[in-house]
């Protein structure tokens, strides 16, 4: 089979075009990422003689986030604008061993949005949300979740719908 010079140049041109398109798409996604999640950990926390879940998200810069509570199944959604994921050692989805959390997953539903979803066994809601300044590893964004029943969950869900952004 003989390939003409013209066909070979056309194939090379298409390859360069696809490579250029790939680079543009990759650069576009990174252009939005002004911040990056560099770590995440979960532990138990005592609040009013009850055990809850403490979620700590470590980032390069102070985190701006919006929180949303959903039911059927219960879950907490954390959207982080202009944030990418730089957590090579953390699986993109996994189980949680601290109640009321049961699992997590993260990704970028849009190039400019980093999203973390915490699946909940029960109708838990954030009772404390705060930021800590860098201490060696980076900025920390902390959310304490506690199951205080379905009514408290619905009240918190409604409040977060009205004012989802946390700075």
State what each model feature region is:
Residues 1-11:
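N-terminal secretory signal peptides that target proteins for export/translocation
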Residues 9, 29-167:
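Signal-peptide-cleaved, periplasmic/extracellular N-terminal interaction regions immediately downstream
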Residues 14-27:
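Bacterial N-terminal signal peptides
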């Amino acid at each position: 089979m003989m390939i003409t010079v013209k066909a070979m140049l056309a194939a090379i041109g298409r390859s360069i075009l696809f490579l250029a398109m790939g680079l543009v798409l990759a650069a576009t996604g990174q252009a939005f990422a002004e911040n990056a999640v560099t770590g995440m950990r979960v532990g138990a926390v005592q609040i009013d003689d009850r055990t809850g879940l403490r979620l700590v998200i470590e980032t390069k810069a102070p985190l701006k986030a919006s929180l949303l509570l959903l039911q059927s199944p219960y879950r907490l959604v954390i959207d982080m604008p202009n944030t990418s994921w730089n957590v090579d050692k953390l699986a993109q989805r996994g189980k949680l061993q601290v109640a009321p959390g049961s699992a997590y997953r993260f990704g970028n539903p849009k190039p400019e949005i980093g999203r973390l979803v915490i699946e909940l066994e029960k109708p838990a809601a954030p009772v404390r949300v705060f930021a800590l300044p860098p201490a060696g590893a980076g900025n920390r964004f902390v959310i304490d979740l506690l199951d205080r029943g379905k009514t408290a969950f619905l009240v918190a869900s409604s409040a977060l719908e009205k004012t989802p952004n946390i700075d």
